[in-house]
Amino acid sequence: MATAVQLVLDAHDPAALARFWAAALGYQIQDPPAGFESWEDFLEAQGIPRERWNDASALVDPEGKGPRIYVQRVPEPKTAKNRLHMDLNVGGGPRVELDERRRRVDEEVARLKGLGATDERGAIERDTEYWVRMNDPEGNEFCVQ
């Protein structure tokens, strides 16, 4: 049996970064526990001080297939390249003609830029591969391929 995985992202503003990744991946912010209309209601009921309400956020695949992503506040800024990054596979893979993969990737890159991502280096093409390195709004690297 495979082990379930949760990805964890460090952030300065967990709520904002969670919203970005939810939109980027087609995920949704995790619902509050049963019996609570909102996370604010839950946190208030737990006695969590208001200044800590943005200490963390989580997003989930609405179909339940992908991993949960937990976004946690950290005090230090990002200072180096990620040791692990996500690849967003939107091109369709090697069975799709390269020109069509380029079109799909470029279209997704434009959408992600509209959400606040930045293009790190422009498109990279090697043999039959095509991808774009990007940064999320807090500088975490990811690729679109």
What are these regions (language model features)?
Residues 2-9, 23-25, 31-34, 44-48, ...:
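Vicinal oxygen chelate
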Residues 52:
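Hydrophobic small-molecule pocket/channel-lining residues, especially in calycin-type beta-barrels
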Residues 93-103:
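Short, flexible/disordered intra-domain loops and linkers
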Residues 12-23:
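Hydrophobic ligand-binding cavity/cleft-lining segments
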Residues 9-10, 100:
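Residues that cap or flank secondary-structure elements
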